[in-house]
Amino acid sequence: MVLSQRQRDELNRAIADYLRSNGYEEAYSVFKKEAELDMNEELDKKYAGLLEKKWTSVIRLQKKVMELESKLNEAKEEINIGGPIGQKRDPKEWIPRPPEKYALSGHRSPVTRVIFHPVFSVIVSASEDATIKVWDHETGDFERTLKGHTDSVQDISFDHTGKLLASCSADMTIKLWDFQGFECIRTMHGHDHNVSSVAIMPNGDHIVSASRDKTIKMWEVATGYCVKTFTGHREWVRMVRPNQDGTLIASSSNDQTVRVWVVATKECKAELREHEHVVECISWAPESAHPTILEATGSETKKSGKPGPFLLSGSRDKTIKMWDVSIGMCLMTLVGHDNWVRGVLVHPGGKYIVSCADDKTLRIWDYKNKRCTKTLSAHEHFVTSLDFHKTAPYVVTGSVDQTVKVWECR
């Protein structure tokens, strides 16, 4: 590329300034003479530090070009996958693909939990800004804000009909919302510290909650009374989740364990210990995944009768573990995240595990082969939560960057 006379003159003056300001006096004198430069104070000011600025801006541009080339290659790959071959892909194998369909903004603090409505095309998000927001995931429209908590909302859960929403907060309360009228119909008090997790039981009659007070409590939906307290964890209980038929609940804790409890007797059926740090998240594997799990793990447990149940856990030790609850054994460990794992789910098709973490990624794991098949750079900050729609091809994520993102699967 040939420079114009003016550009050449500017470059020469910038080089001369660089040589002089860095003490290369002899080189400066020779260069000034050979380039026939007439340097003066006014011109000197204009070109001071110009060469360094140009150099750093070139490096910055090169980095940006590399990033854009990487994104372009990723987009080309996605287009190829989404072409005629991709269209033949079994819906059970659909996974989230970049870029996101929507990035929803509105929360003023980190998003702590995101969930899909079981019936309507609605997403609900909870945040440290003490609000719950409702969005339409098909249009990306914001619908409304539910206010009532006075501190960070930590978790939210629908009943199977989608008519009731439960929420819990660092304000030490659990609230029950009529999701048709968007009104708080009950507030439950009883925990002595931050309530970190809540879930409505499958029968819809009870709610379970977990707290920093080291307990798990069960509440009656009709009255708001606490009917059971499960004790055993030695530290903050981070998450609680019931299994599909509501006979068991699983909990994870800062004490680095996962516990499984029999609801009827409050007995701790299993204490699962292999994580080396706080266990942030848990989820039960649906029955649709059991055949793949048995094939993947070569598990010979329960040859007679139903296999499992199987449980997933994600930890600050950066790993995901799969457990056979019936024998209290870890079946596999998935390693790949570069920071705390904050969310983990089995894909509705049963073939994949989907996880999110503080490394800002969403990862899809082919657990049969124990490898990560896809990594999405999902957010600008820690990814705190994810949910997979049970029937429609969508995944939703929430982040410390205060956004909620909807991802289309194909």
Swiss-Prot record:
Can self-associate. Component of the cytosolic PAF-AH (I) heterotetrameric enzyme, which is composed of PAFAH1B1 (beta), PAFAH1B2 (alpha2) and PAFAH1B3 (alpha1) subunits. The catalytic activity of the enzyme resides in the alpha1 (PAFAH1B3) and alpha2 (PAFAH1B2) subunits, whereas the beta subunit (PAFAH1B1) has regulatory activity. Trimer formation is not essential for the catalytic activity. Interacts with dynein, dynactin, nde1 and ndel1. GO terms for cellular component: 1-alkyl-2-acetylglycerophosphocholine esterase complex; axon cytoplasm; centrosome; cytoplasm; cytoplasmic microtubule; kinetochore; microtubule associated complex; neuron projection. Residues 56-83 form a coiled coil. InterPro entries: Coatomer_complex_subunit, Dynein_regulator_LIS1, G-protein_beta_WD-40_rep, LIS1_N, LisH, PAC1-like_LisH-like_dom, WD40/YVTN_repeat-like_dom_sf, WD40_repeat_CS. GO terms for biological process: brain morphogenesis; cell division; establishment of mitotic spindle orientation; germ cell development; microtubule organizing center organization; microtubule sliding; nuclear migration; reelin-mediated signaling pathway. One of its GO terms (molecular function) is protein heterodimerization activity. Keywords: Cell cycle, Cell division, Coiled coil, Cytoplasm, Cytoskeleton, Developmental protein, Differentiation, Microtubule, Mitosis, Neurogenesis, Repeat, Transport, WD repeat. Belongs to the WD repeat LIS1/nudF family. WD repeats lie at residues 106-145, 148-187, 190-229, 232-271, 274-333, 336-375, 378-410. Residues 7-39 form the LisH domain. Regulatory subunit (beta subunit) of the cytosolic type I platelet-activating factor (PAF) acetylhydrolase (PAF-AH (I)), an enzyme that catalyzes the hydrolyze of the acetyl group at the sn-2 position of PAF and its analogs and participates in PAF inactivation. Regulates the PAF-AH (I) activity in a catalytic dimer composition-dependent manner. Positively regulates the activity of the minus-end directed microtubule motor protein dynein. May enhance dynein-mediated microtubule sliding by targeting dynein to the microtubule plus end. This is Lissencephaly-1 homolog A. The lineage of its organism: Eukaryota, Metazoa, Chordata, Craniata, Vertebrata. SUPFAM superfamilies: Lissencephaly-1 protein (Lis-1, PAF-AH alpha) N-terminal domain, WD40 repeat-like. The keyword Transport applies. Dimerization mediated by the LisH domain may be required to activate dynein. It is found in: Cytoplasm, Cytoskeleton; Cytoplasm, Cytoskeleton, Microtubule organizing center, Centrosome. It comes from the Eukaryota.
